[in-house]
Amino acid sequence: SGNTSLDLENMFLRVGVQAKAVLDPHFQAQVASLLTVNDLVIIFSLSGKTKDTYDSLKIAKKNGAKIIAITNYIHSPIGKSADLVLQTAIEEFLNGGSLAGKISQLYICDLLVHGYEQNNNIDSVELREKVLRSIIDKSIE
């Protein structure tokens, strides 16, 4: 789930949104403590029961941040505490970290980013080209 949050951070960057993926649980709690009603947190937890993630969610919620949870289990502690749950449908625990779980999360991330683009009339082609130009000549001949 942590790697998927990094992917979502990059996806949002390409449409002009400066998002931050925070993987370290202690840093998550610190960041959550500074959030406000103007902030949105997107939480990834296939089980919906990850303690560190849940603890940070509670801190963020206490500060008024809106919470979107991407999880398999809408009735899990994380699912119940979120303002919105986007449900995946993968039995992740069978092999702990399956590609299917990541793909399920990435699909939801793609929908979130495209929804953001549509709702905010974002010219994503122009922004993506701008980002691409920033890295196009990074190879050494």
What spans do the regions from the language model cover?
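A short, charged, Gly/Pro-tolerant segment at domain boundaries
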Residues: I122-E141
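Glycine-rich phosphate-binding loops that contact phosphosugars or nucleotide phosphates
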Residues: S1-Y107, L111-N120
